[in-house]
């Protein structure tokens, strides 16, 4: 079944501009509170200008262009401008440093980069090293350095025609993006995403949250991340909704922004929920129009109940990863939600729990969550230039091995246990980091927690907890270990604890455990 009707991203935007015209498509708010707004028609014009800019710089179908940007309208212009001429976007995590960024440029053979003034010094050094194919930089900012191979994005883009001057033949099977995974445990892999993937993501995620053209979808997720692209931007645009993109997350400003833009849908990760909960209670806490909060793992039942009760919202759980494009398991529109289940498998997918011999397991037994989709359509096409890694993750029949542990109940609801690489082996027992983190996070003095396994000569691995306390709190080791002993089996109690001011995180809020080992 061809859900997208053979429509590529160029056709999508031309149709959206014709159907919705002056209706607001995009609202962007900077950290300084500066607001920029675009209708569907004007946004399509900006996209066309950007496509023509890339063409004027020698970019053609199949060429790869990197974006190293914080959230901004120009990211949207570039994303779809590249797609309109058949070129390929390579978004770079805005938190990456020089060596990490250079590795992605080299791996994907990028010759052109769009970035902002704050990241320019890093890329000037990369160009001078001649270690990558990078030979031209389009810079977004007020001032332009007097360097060869650098052009002013806004000045050149604004002079372009709003009519496309290069329209190569496009197929929904064409690659639109290479999105490198976060690489919390190893070098990132380039996930190849097609036009079909993105069009499907728009329809699927709009179905998941029952999105309509009178909805306002607000997000603080980074635009270079799959969540922002495929569970926020694509469904919002596909449904003709208004997409509100904030430059950065602020716990103090979040609810005022929800009210300011009359958002009806937003998305949250656990870090956001925890920081919102430590803000002072206000009479306006429940004064908003939110009907759904898209939520991504992982939260304890106590945290979930406290959040939903205080703010009068409900969480719509969605489970997925870069390779699945969307939340392939999740709560469904109108269905009763069964916390802590991550929901049921969505339309056009199959899901199974499998053992270490790749055999399906019955309800109630823990194994690996495996997903069946269509490569290049409902799941990613492949890892860029890594056929062996692709073969390990993706079976020929379309079964994707997620690397996550979970189980399902008799009614087909799935439950996430942990990343398989996060299971600690302690004296013959398997201990879930997520389970311990959920228990420990209930301590009233603790704001953030992560558990890791460290080498132990006797028991294979010992358990260590890294903790961030609420402001002004103190916590002794005796108090911490007593709490653990009273709330978990003895073999699960951590052997060590360390208090920190913060925990290292990637762009999607996931803690980078390799920095804590």
Swiss-Prot record:
UniProt pathway: Amine and polyamine metabolism; carnitine metabolism
Keyword field contains Transport: no
Biological processes, Gene Ontology terms: carnitine metabolic process; fatty acid metabolic process
Gene Ontology molecular function, alphabetical: carnitine-CoA ligase activity; crotonobetaine-CoA ligase activity; medium-chain fatty acid-CoA ligase activity
Enzyme Commission number(s) of this protein: 6.2.1.48
Disulfide bond sites: none
InterPro entries: AMP-bd_C (IPR025110), AMP-bd_C_sf (IPR045851), AMP-binding_CS (IPR020845), AMP-dep_synth/lig_dom (IPR000873), ANL_N_sf (IPR042099), CaiC (IPR023456)
Catalytically driven reaction(s): 4-(trimethylamino)butanoate + ATP + CoA = 4-(trimethylamino)butanoyl-CoA + AMP + diphosphate; crotonobetaine + ATP + CoA = crotonobetainyl-CoA + AMP + diphosphate; (R)-carnitine + ATP + CoA = (R)-carnitinyl-CoA + AMP + diphosphate
A Pfam family hit: AMP-binding_C
Cell division as UniProt keyword: no
Protein keywords: Ligase
Domain of life per record: Bacteria
Gene3D superfamilies, alphabetized: 3.30.300.30, N-terminal domain of ligase-like (3.40.50.12780)
Family per record: Belongs to the ATP-dependent AMP-binding enzyme family.
Protein purpose: Catalyzes the transfer of CoA to carnitine, generating the initial carnitinyl-CoA needed for the CaiB reaction cycle. Also has activity toward crotonobetaine and gamma-butyrobetaine.
Full protein name: Crotonobetaine/carnitine--CoA ligase
Protein's organism: Salmonella paratyphi B (strain ATCC BAA-1250 / SPB7)
Gene behind this protein: caiC
